[in-house]
């Protein structure tokens, strides 16, 4: 009788050595994001982080998100170095709207066969996003799962925890008629609406490499999500912010009402900004109705801030000094009965 061939985990499609190589490759990216509150080093069973001592009544704020089908485009066009920024942005931008300073971030990277070079590029991007937001990358999970993903496909998820002083939580309760609305420009579609983006590319049979305003269309589509944390933390400290809305999935119609009292509505001046070219291209080539555009995409507006009207000039000056493109986009008005909570004029 012949002796059965001994099997290893690698024979089953899981390469532990590749995982170890990845950990070695990302150490510099992780170290760059370290905050003084972080305890211990990468590789422990659990990651430890103290709450900053400046907080008297700290409230932890958490969020989790992914990059959605933007990953499909990134994988197809081998653009792996910025999807990590997208991942962090989608989480930390959700935290900042409640006034929370991001503390730490963890990522989950899942694939059928671990490509160390690709994974290193992705995690380095996560490190860059954490650096941009002042958030420590303190841990994560790399799951190599043969038979679960096809070819070079992978998926990402992120989890972030931030902290805010209990008395300083921004929850929209101070919003009142007469408040002004300031918009902060997006860098592109960010990480929302990409199933529709891909459908437009399919139906129009457009060449993703075609020129659009001086650079390939695909570069517009894969532009990383803008991170607003540092500029908005400064604005929160300097001004009286009543509410903030991160314009993500659901666009204007779904996200702005999340931070408004029932008796208030947002009146948006649709002519106060010009849509970036990529949104006009999507609308034209997909024959998408304007209502659907505002429901699916940010249309050039990544964040909306509600604040007293007499604080607008100072806020715009501060944001400009921080490198943000911002403008007065509308105002809060009294809402009657079952009126829609968002009007775009």
UniProtKB/Swiss-Prot annotation:
GO molecular function, one term: ATP binding
This enzyme's EC code(s): 6.3.3.1
Main location: cytoplasm
Reactions catalysed: 2-formamido-N(1)-(5-O-phospho-beta-D-ribosyl)acetamidine + ATP = 5-amino-1-(5-phospho-beta-D-ribosyl)imidazole + ADP + phosphate + H(+)
GO BP term, example: 'de novo' IMP biosynthetic process
GO cellular component, one term: cytosol
Disulfide bonds: none
Pathway: Purine metabolism; IMP biosynthesis via de novo pathway; 5-amino-1-(5-phospho-D-ribosyl)imidazole from N(2)-formyl-N(1)-(5-phospho-D-ribosyl)glycinamide: step 2/2
Keyword terms, alphabetized: ATP-binding, Cytoplasm, Ligase, Nucleotide-binding, Purine biosynthesis
One Pfam family in the UniProt entry: AIRS_C
Subcellular location, record wording: Cytoplasm
SUPFAM superfamilies per UniProt: PurM C-terminal domain-like, PurM N-terminal domain-like
Enzyme class: ligase
Family the UniProt entry places it in: Belongs to the AIR synthase family.
Protein name according to UniProt: Phosphoribosylformylglycinamidine cyclo-ligase
